[in-house]
């Protein structure tokens, strides 16, 4: 991630209807956090070098405490925690049947980049976002928990999903 990509995402990626809660203008502080670039936030480019998505990576311990970016290089710490991914696809690419492939590529990159040897990769999604849930299920993720989450200050029923990546 760099300033040009982060600024483009924040200023121009707008989603329609109920998906507007995912607009990156609501995530400007996070996306423009230079400390996170290359450690917790990554750009996704296609073969032609065009920006097509973003990937956010986090690690959580059993108490669901977040691991600071400064500790991401410490394999001893990260491999004792669960890897969680979040991502966004450029709005004009959504709804074209590419979601499962996109999610699998994001998960694989996160695993390889951090040399993650944990058992699961997790993610969270609002229940109303059935389009995303179907893509995640196609990518091998399964619901393991229902919860209430907050997205841009609004509460939503959410599901946590995970995919087993190691035996």
Can you annotate each of these PLM segments?
Residues 2-5, 129:
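Acidic/polar helix N-cap motif
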Residues 3-4, 11-94, 109-116, 164-166:
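Acetyl-CoA-dependent GNAT
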Residues 58, 122-124, 144:
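Solvent-exposed beta-strand sheet faces enriched in polar/charged residues
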Residues 84, 88, 122-124, 160:
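Conserved beta-strand segments that form the floor/walls of ligand-binding pockets within enzyme
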Residues 89, 95-110, 134, 138:
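Conserved acetyl-CoA-binding loop-helix of GNAT-fold acetyltransferases
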Residues 117-133, 149-155, 162:
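Conserved beta-strand-loop-alpha-helix junction that forms the acyl-donor binding cleft
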Residues 136-146:
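Conserved acetyl-CoA-binding loop of GNAT-fold acetyltransferases
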